[in-house]
């Protein structure tokens, strides 16, 4: 008790220092208290009562500096998460704490099996996994004074271990696409764990592709899941479609953009999707594909013999192999609509874009004559 109490002095000093140095922008920085206190590896004995006391004392110390600071927790993972979230919210209610937001972590991997330096396991059913988040949201909203406060997923990924090779695969990319289509339903934000593979929680990795958490392998080599996020970033506009297989939007300029995926554990093989857009005229269809043979540096590294260290030339090659396959074609409207059909390989992600073709060719220019040699 004395240790926690005395640490409040340092918390207040730190916040005042940050305010002095960076100004009131600091007030927009959410303050999350601790990390996974429901695990004994991060909080001694996973002692819930001690964590709740820490949370209350920290919240009060922060608010004493400036009541505009936003404070939240409990930053739990999926272990006994229902019990922890219920008890956390009850504690905040009973003590009339001015809780600003709620946080938790989200992983979707069965208990892994260790084999040498690596861990392997099955990805859970996405919809079943997402129910965990709805349960947390419902618990929060069952307290009238906290109903509707933001819920942030401050960590999410498939496996919760940084030695799970699934992280490096196109299967991971397709699975994460499936999650991204729904994670915004009950959460204010969701943060993928992590950006890069420079991570030493279990020691220094043995190989360039070792199942690290990151979107990017060491050496700035994008993994397939990097492109899932890059593709979703392009989806800004009016939502036209959101399903288990695709998301599409109409942009302000009239173009259409979307992401489609094929999660093999749900489809069992390749799949085909057809999108119909009511319109007239000629359109350009652009696709960027991530699958087993495109934007998959893991396969190239494997085919090269899985070298444990990379020369500069190999690193360059793997970066080059990490780019999606880009294709374009022209589509003409028939009967008042344009139809785009995508064939998706198992465990693939495809970005697609439909843009109206406008303008005329320069005088005398013929693409057909150029490519046919006439």
Residue ranges and their predicted role:
Residues 48-182, 186-188, 207:
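Noncatalytic carbohydrate-binding groove/subsite architecture in carbohydrate-active enzymes
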Residues 29-36, 154:
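Short, conserved phosphate-binding/catalytic loop or strand-edge motifs used
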Residues 16-26, 91-98:
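Acidic (Asp/Glu)-rich catalytic clusters
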Residues 279-340, 363:
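Acidic, Ser/Thr/Pro-rich beta/coil linker or hinge segments at domain junctions
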Residues 357-374:
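Terminal connector regions
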Residues 243-303, 343-355, 361:
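Carbohydrate-binding surface patches
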